[in-house]
């Protein structure tokens, strides 16, 4: 199925279901928080927040989206793309979870000849937010999805937000099983290469506040009304329906690759991975560049313009590395137009401008390449004249920084000149540049608008950290900031709770948040004439790795820049933090003992009494592995290992076997933390206990997935661990008392009760269905005549599900013969729900009756809604009081037909 057909079917499906088709917004919106539109719902945010009244209750669109954080990964893997199309359906206070699930399931599983995509229902899985029992029930009832193909996942996976303040809520994702040739079974939780996500249903019900990451943010409260936002990836669906492994093989990007291959001396897919990467970069970036130019972006040196410039220059550079020396961008824009024009007519109508801008950038960059090449030749000649065989890192950096030369291009040109490149020196200079940029970014994060004054503090007055040796330090105030502005004085009388107040000190015992360890808490108090001044420290951040910024609340007196103060860490807080950090090292060591050296750290968080450790690992841990990890850790606690730290050279630390976080940049001199000699040895700048016994018991709470190939272990330490165990013990004692068995027999007793309950429920269902079928026989005999139609419209016994009703409707319809007939059954369900099913046989359809139309009349009387096909439709409502009215409304509707 071609991509344009996939798009058409999506829009047609939802337009038929009462949605208004809304054109894609530009990828550029007037939003300071958003560089590019990166989700289908962005243009509807004011509606979701209740800031504007939508002109429709249901909408559908296919949105152009751009994401560039992983631009360097494009081409290297086949999963990353800078441009993608997000098909979505949206409800603004209209339908909610049930409707979203039903619409998605119908489109995915309906046969191709009925307007669907024809996915095999047996190949579909769903994930839901771990607390969303309602979604699990709906997947079973609406889609018939068995419980074994529904998986619960945590906030990082199934609680959606845009990553910035705005709407948020639990989500449910639909996955397609590609089969055993793509990996192990077990659903998305086990293998996201085999199980591919194609659709995300977001049940938008809250607004999120400030925060970082996928789960570290505040949920502010409910939205004015519940909304639905879904997103189906057009490219991923195209891959599956076209039977290819990745988007580069679809009708969207393969034409671009073929156009390049027709001009390059080396073809695509001929065994050279580096060449294939270049082909994919050209295909992806050409498409994104065309979309950006079409939406009004021009190449520039900052913001969106810089992204476009970088994309085009990567295209040009990749083409040259493939051996294409002449101009190529103009032809690539034409190929993109031909492939994407049917979906985005602006690429056709505005093609001349798009091509002109792209070609102008190519011409300019070719001049840059020419100038840079001359600089390279001069540097190469100077290097050889000096008797060296390696181009300096400074020369490579200048080529990169001044002329935009990627290091890969410099490396290739150097190899052609029989020279190596000082990559380490280049990376060091790049790191310095990034550090300067990070200092600015960190300053902005701290809301410092006076960046010049802030840089002065960074350069002239680095903070001396004293917290390894003492918890109380005499210090001088270097700077005071209120809401990001530097001020000379701040006092209790002038600073309210709404103000963000920060003190910068020349010396500090407070640990600043880093390395997974959260910041210390404590107090800063005045001395001498300012002895009445007191502030509570709630957070400490490090700027440019040299300056400690203390977030405070002024409780009394006033602080003046230059004053001498006493900075004191809360000893209980520090002790808890050291327990968590040392516990993290020990859990890491235990993981590697049990799982082997491939269990490498991917991240961590430790705070008083708690630790969280992420590590690279494929698949969930077994119960035995979790038990072993916990046992090894606690054996090390009991061994009372000595914990000590020392400073040494980086290379020496590595030769000793010290563990380092992959991808982290370390200085030449590093701090090493050793626990029990060979048990644990890691590079670390955090605070730790003096002996392993001070950690106290370590209790592993659980293990989960936080992404493809990354697992997470969470644990309590110290008193928090004891309290958790005491709570578990009390819970077990209560269960044992209720079940009247010893504690060790509780699991077996509970398992037995569960089996008995399942058997009883199964027997109850069988009896209820048998009674209902007996009633159905009587219903056939008592069918009433309404006009030309035989009608069976009955209120069934309570407790029947929609599935039970469908079974009975089928039985009754089969017994009514070939005369025009309509069957409508309604029952009182759980929690005052009212499920109903309507069936219309072919003869009645010939009279103009449609089940999906009748079910609307039926549902209106019970405050519900439904949908389906002409022969069979179903729905549900609220309130059994309306059942008789629903049956009467149905009779009246049939009588009118």
UniProtKB/Swiss-Prot annotation:
The keyword Transmembrane helix does not apply. It catalyses: tRNA(Ala) + L-alanine + ATP = L-alanyl-tRNA(Ala) + AMP + diphosphate. GO terms for biological process: alanyl-tRNA aminoacylation. It is found in: Cytoplasm. Its EC number is 6.1.1.7. It holds the Pfam family tRNA_SAD. One of its GO terms (cellular component) is cytosol. InterPro entries: aa-tRNA-synth_II/BPL/LPL, Ala-tRNA-lgiase_IIc, Ala-tRNA-ligase_IIc_anticod-bd, Ala-tRNA-synth_IIc_core, Ala-tRNA-synth_IIc_N, Ala-tRNA_ligase, Ala_tRNA_ligase_euk/bac, DHHA1_dom. The keyword Signal does not apply. Keywords: Aminoacyl-tRNA synthetase, ATP-binding, Cytoplasm, Ligase, Metal-binding, Nucleotide-binding, Protein biosynthesis, RNA-binding, tRNA-binding, Zinc. Binds 1 zinc ion per subunit. Transmembrane segments: none annotated. Zn(2+) binds at residues 581, 585, 684, 688. Its cofactor is Zn(2+). GO terms for molecular function: alanine-tRNA ligase activity; aminoacyl-tRNA deacylase activity; ATP binding; tRNA binding; zinc ion binding. Consists of three domains; the N-terminal catalytic domain, the editing domain and the C-terminal C-Ala domain. The editing domain removes incorrectly charged amino acids, while the C-Ala domain, along with tRNA(Ala), serves as a bridge to cooperatively bring together the editing and aminoacylation centers thus stimulating deacylation of misacylated tRNAs. Belongs to the class-II aminoacyl-tRNA synthetase family. Catalyzes the attachment of alanine to tRNA(Ala) in a two-step reaction: alanine is first activated by ATP to form Ala-AMP and then transferred to the acceptor end of tRNA(Ala). Also edits incorrectly charged Ser-tRNA(Ala) and Gly-tRNA(Ala) via its editing domain. This is Alanine--tRNA ligase. It comes from Mycobacterium sp. (strain KMS). The lineage of its organism: Bacteria, Bacillati, Actinomycetota, Actinomycetes, Mycobacteriales.
């Amino acid at each position: 199925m071609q991509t344009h057909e996939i798009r058409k079917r999506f829009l047609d499906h939802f337009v038929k279901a009462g949605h208004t088709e809304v054109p894609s917004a530009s990828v550029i919106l007037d939003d300071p928080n958003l560089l590019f539109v990166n989700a289908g719902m962005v243009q509807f945010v004011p509606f979701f927040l209740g800031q504007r009244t939508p002109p429709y209750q249901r909408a559908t669109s296919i949105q152009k989206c751009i994401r560039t954080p992983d631009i360097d990964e494009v081409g290297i893997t086949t999963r990353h793309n800078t441009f993608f199309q997000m098909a979505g359906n949206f409800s603004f206070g209209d339908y909610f979870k049930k409707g979203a699930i039903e619409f998605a399931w119908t489109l995915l599983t309906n046969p191709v000849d009925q307007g669907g995509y024809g996915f095999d229902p047996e190949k579909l899985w769903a994930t839901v937010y771990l607390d969303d029992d309602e979604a699990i029930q709906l997947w079973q009832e609406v889609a018939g999805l068995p419980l074994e193909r529904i998986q619960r996942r945590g906030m990082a996976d199934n609680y959606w937000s845009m990553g910035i303040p705005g709407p948020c809520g639990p989500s449910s994702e639909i996955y397609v099983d590609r089969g055993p040739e793509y990996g192990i079974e077990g659903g998305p939780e086990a293998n996201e290469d085999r199980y591919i996500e194609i659709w995300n249903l977001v049940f938008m019900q809250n607004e999120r506040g400030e925060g970082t990451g996928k789960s570290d943010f505040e949920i502010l409260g409910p939205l004015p009304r519940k909304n639905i936002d879904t997103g189906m990836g057009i490219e991923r669906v195209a891959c599956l329906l076209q039977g290819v492994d990745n988007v580069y093989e679809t009708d969207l990007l393969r034409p671009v690759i073929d156009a390049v291959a027709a001009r390059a001396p080396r073809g695509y897919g001929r065994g050279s991975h580096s060449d294939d990467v270049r082909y994919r970069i050209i295909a992806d970036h050409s498409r994104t560049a065309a979309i950006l130019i079409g939406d009004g972006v021009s190449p520039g040196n900052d913001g969106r313009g810089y992204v476009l410039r970088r994309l085009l220059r990567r295209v040009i550079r990749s083409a040259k590395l493939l051996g294409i020396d002449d101009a190529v961008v103009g032809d690539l824009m034409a190929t993109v137009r031909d492939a994407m024009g049917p979906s985005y007519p602006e690429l056709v109508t505005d093609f001349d401008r798009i091509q002109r801008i792209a070609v102008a950038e190519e011409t300019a960059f070719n001049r840059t390449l020419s100038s840079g090449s001359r600089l390279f030749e001069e540097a190469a000649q100077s290097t050889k004249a000096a008797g060296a065989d390696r181009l300096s890192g400074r020369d490579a950096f200048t080529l990169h920084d001044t002329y935009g030369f990627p290091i890969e291009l410099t490396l290739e040109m150097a190899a052609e000149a029989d020279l190596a490149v000082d990559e380490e020196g280049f990376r060091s200079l790049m790191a310095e540049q990034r550090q300067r940029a990070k200092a600015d970014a960190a300053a902005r994060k701290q809301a410092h608008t006076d960046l010049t004054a802030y840089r002065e503090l960074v350069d002239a007055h680095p903070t001396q950290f004293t917290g390894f040796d003492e918890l109380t330090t005499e210090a001088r105030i270097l700077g005071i900031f209120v809401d990001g502005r530097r001020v000379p004085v701040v006092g209790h009388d002038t600073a309210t709770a709404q103000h963000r107040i920060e003190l910068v000190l020349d010396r500090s015992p407070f640990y600043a948040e880093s390395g997974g360890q959260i910041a210390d808490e404590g107090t800063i108090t005045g001395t001498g004439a300012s002895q009445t001044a007191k502030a509570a420290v709630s957070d400490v951040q490090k700027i440019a790795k040299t300056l400690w910024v203390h977030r405070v609340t002024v409780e009394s007196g006033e602080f003046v820049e230059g004053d001498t103060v006493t900075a004191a860490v809360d000893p209980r807080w520090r002790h808890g933090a050291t327990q968590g950090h040392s516990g993290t090292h020990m859990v890491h060591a235990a993981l590697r003992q049990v799982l082997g050296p491939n269990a490498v750290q991917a991240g961590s968080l430790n705070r008083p009494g708690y630790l969280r450790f992420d590590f690279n690992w494929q698949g969930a841990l077994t119960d035995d592995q979790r038990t072993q990890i916990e046992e090894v850790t606690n054996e090390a606690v009991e061994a009372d290992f000595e914990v000590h730290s020392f400073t040494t050279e980086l290379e020496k630390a590595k030769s000793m076997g010290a563990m380092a976080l992959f991808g982290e940049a370390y200085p030449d001199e590093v701090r090493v933390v050793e626990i029990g000699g060979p048990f644990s040895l890691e590079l670390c700048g955090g605070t730790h206990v003096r002996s392993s016994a001070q950690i106290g018991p370590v209790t592993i709470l659980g293990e989960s997935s936080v992404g493809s190939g990354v697992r997470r272990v969470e644990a309590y330490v110290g008193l928090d661990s004891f309290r958790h165990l005491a709570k578990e013990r009390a819970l077990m004692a209560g269960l044992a008392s209720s079940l009247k068995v010893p504690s060790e027999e509780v699991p077996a007793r509970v398992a037995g009760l569960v089996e008995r309950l399942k058997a009883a429920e199964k027997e109850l269902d069988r009896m209820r269905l048998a009674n209902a079928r007996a009633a159905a026989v009587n219903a056939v005999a008592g069918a009433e005549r309404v006009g030309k139609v035989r009608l069976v419209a009955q209120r069934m016994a309570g407790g029947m599900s929609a599935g039970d009703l469908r079974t009975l409707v089928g039985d009754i319809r089969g017994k009514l013969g070939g005369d025009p007939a309509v069957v409508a059954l309604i029952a009182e369900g759980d929690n005052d729900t009212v499920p109903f099913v309507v069936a219309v046989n072919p003869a009645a359809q010939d009279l103009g009756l449609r089940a999906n139309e009748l079910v609307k009349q039926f549902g209106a009387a019970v405050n519900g809604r439904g949908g389906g096909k002409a022969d069979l439709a179903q729905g549900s409502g609220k309130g059994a009081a309306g059942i008789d009215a629903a049956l009467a409304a149905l009779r009246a509707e049939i009588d009118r037909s």
